[in-house]
C-alpha cells in the first residue's frame, strides 16, 4: 500500500485546539496517513517563499479560522496540494466544516470523498526606484498598499493596462481577489465577487478625491500603482495581512492574476450564494417585510388579528383600525443591516 501523507496546520492560541488536533491526528493515522503537525508558522519576509510541503502530501488539514488558512496557503502555494479548512475561529469563510464535524471531515478525506475548488491568486511585482528586476509576491485574499506614516497621506497614481485612471492622496488602496472580496475589501466598501469570476478589484481607502470608487478589472488586465515622488508619506505593502515591507517614494506596484491557483477541498456542493448568506447571517428579509410579518399577529381592539396586507395598507378591513407605524430600519432583531 502506498504511503499517504497529511499535514495538519493548527491555531495554537485557540483554547479548544488541543482536543480537536489530537482527535484529527488520531483518526488520520487510523486511516493510514503519516501526519506532520505544523503549529507555528511565522510570517516570511515580503518576496520570500517559505518551504512548501512535499509534493507527495495528499492534503493539508487546517484547524483554525481564515487567518490559519492563509498561513497554510503559504505552505501549498507552489504545489497542487489541496487545503481542507475546519473552522475553529469566528466566521471561517474559507473553511468547509465546523470543529464538531471533525469525524466526518476526516472520514471524507480518508475515502477521497471531496471535490476541488480552485481559487484565483493575485501576483504582485514591486519595482523599487532604480531596480533592474522586481520583488515578486502573491496573495490569496488581498494586497494592501497603505501609508507608512500614520499622520500623512500617501500620494498614489492608479493605472489600468498602462492607462492612467486617477491620482489622489489616501490612506492607501486594497487590491482584492474574488476570495478576498468578503474580507478587508468588503469592510472597506467593495462589492462581493463570486469565486468563479476572474477579476481583481481596487478599493481606495479614505481617498481625498471627488472620484475615487472601487474599480474591477478582468483577468487579462493589470493594476499599476505608483507612489508619487512627492508623496508626503512612504508606502507600506502587505500580502494577506502577513508578508510586508516599506516602499519608498517612486516605487511602482503591479498586480495581475497569477498563473497559479490555490486548491480548496470541498466536502459539499453548497453554492457560494448559500455560503455567503449562512456565514454572514444575512438578514434576507427587509425591514418592511419584517414589519408586515409582525403586524400579521397584532391584536385588534376586539381581540382578533388582521392580515399583513391590510396592515400594510393602513386599514384592518371592516374593523376600521389603522395600522401602527412599522419598525424603522436598523431596529429589527437588534441586528445591523448587511
Curated annotation (Swiss-Prot):
Taxonomically, the superkingdom here is Bacteria
| Basic and acidic residues composition bias: residue spans | 325-338
Region Disordered: what ranges? 317-338
Q: Where in the cell is it found?
A: Cytoplasm
Query: Catalytic center at which residues?
Result: 66 (proton acceptor)
- Residues engaged in binding NAD(+): 66-67, 71, 141-142, 152, 171, 182-187, 206
A single GO CC term for this protein reads:
cytoplasm
Reactions performed catalytically? NAD(+) + ATP = ADP + NADP(+) + H(+)
SUPFAM superfamilies (alphabetical) = NAD kinase/diacylglycerol kinase-like (SSF111331)
Recorded GO molecular functions are:
ATP binding; metal ion binding; NAD binding; NAD+ kinase activity
Q: What is its main location?
A: cytoplasm
Which EC numbers does the record give? 2.7.1.23
Cofactor(s) of this protein? a divalent metal cation
EC category:
transferase
- Annotated GO biological process: NAD metabolic process; NADP biosynthetic process
Family that this chain belongs to: Belongs to the NAD kinase family.
- State its role: Involved in the regulation of the intracellular balance of NAD and NADP, and is a key enzyme in the biosynthesis of NADP. Catalyzes specifically the phosphorylation on 2'-hydroxyl of the adenosine moiety of NAD to yield NADP.
What protein is this chain from?
Answer: NAD kinase
Q: What is the lineage of its organism?
A: Bacteria, Bacillati, Actinomycetota, Actinomycetes, Bifidobacteriales
Question: What is the gene called?
Answer: nadK
Amino acid at each position: 500500500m502506498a504511503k499517504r501523507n497529511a499535514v495538519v496546520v493548527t491555531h495554537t492560541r485557540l483554547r479548544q485546539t488541543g482536543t480537536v488536533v489530537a482527535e484529527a491526528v488520531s483518526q488520520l493515522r487510523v486511516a493510514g496517513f503519516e501526519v506532520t503537525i505544523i503549529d507555528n508558522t511565522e510570517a516570511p519576509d515580503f518576496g520570500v517563499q517559505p518551504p512548501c510541503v512535499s509534493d507527495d502530501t495528499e492534503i493539508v488539514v487546517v484547524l483554525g479560522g481564515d487567518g490559519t488558512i492563509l498561513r497554510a496557503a503559504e505552505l501549498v502555494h507552489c504545489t497542487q496540494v489541496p487545503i481542507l479548512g475546519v473552522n475553529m475561529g469566528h466566521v471561517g469563510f474559507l473553511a468547509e466544516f465546523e470543529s464538531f464535524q471533525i469525524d466526518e471531515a476526516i472520514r471524507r478525506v480518508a475515502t477521497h470523498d471531496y471535490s476541488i475548488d480552485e481559487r484565483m491568486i493575485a501576483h504582485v511585482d514591486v519595482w523599487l526606484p532604480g531596480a533592474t528586476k522586481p520583488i515578486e509576491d502573491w496573495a490569496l485574499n488581498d494586497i494592501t498598499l497603505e501609508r507608512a506614516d500614520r499622520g500623512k497621506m500617501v500620494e498614489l497614481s492608479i493605472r489600468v493596462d498602462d492607462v492612467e485612471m486617477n491620482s489622489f492622496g489616501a490612506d492607501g488602496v486594497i487590491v482584492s481577489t474574488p476570495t478576498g472580496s468578503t474580507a478587508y475589501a468588503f469592510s472597506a466598501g467593495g462589492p462581493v465577487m463570486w469565486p468563479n469570476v476572474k477579476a481583481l478589484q481596487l478599493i481606495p481607502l479614505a481617498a481625498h478625491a471627488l472620484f475615487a470608487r472601487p474599480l474591477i478589472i478582468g483577468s487579462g488586465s493589470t493594476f499599476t500603482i505608483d507612489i508619487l515622488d512627492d508623496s508626503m508619506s512612504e508606502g507600506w505593502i502587505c500580502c494577506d495581512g502577513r508578508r510586508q515591507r516599506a516602499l519608498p517614494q517612486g516605487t511602482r506596484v503591479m498586480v495581475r492574476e497569477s498563473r497559479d491557483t490555490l486548491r480548496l477541498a470541498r466536502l459539499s456542493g453548497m453554492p457560494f450564494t448559500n455560503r455567503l448568506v449562512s456565514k454572514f447571517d444575512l438578514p434576507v428579509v427587509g425591514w418592511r417585510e419584517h414589519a408586515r410579518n409582525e403586524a400579521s399577529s397584532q391584536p385588534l381592539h376586539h381581540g382578533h388579528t388582521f392580515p399583513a396586507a391590510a396592515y400594510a395598507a393602513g386599514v384592518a378591513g371592516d374593523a376600521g383600525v389603522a395600522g401602527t407605524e412599522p419598525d424603522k430600519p436598523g431596529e429589527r432583531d437588534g441586528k445591523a443591516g448587511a
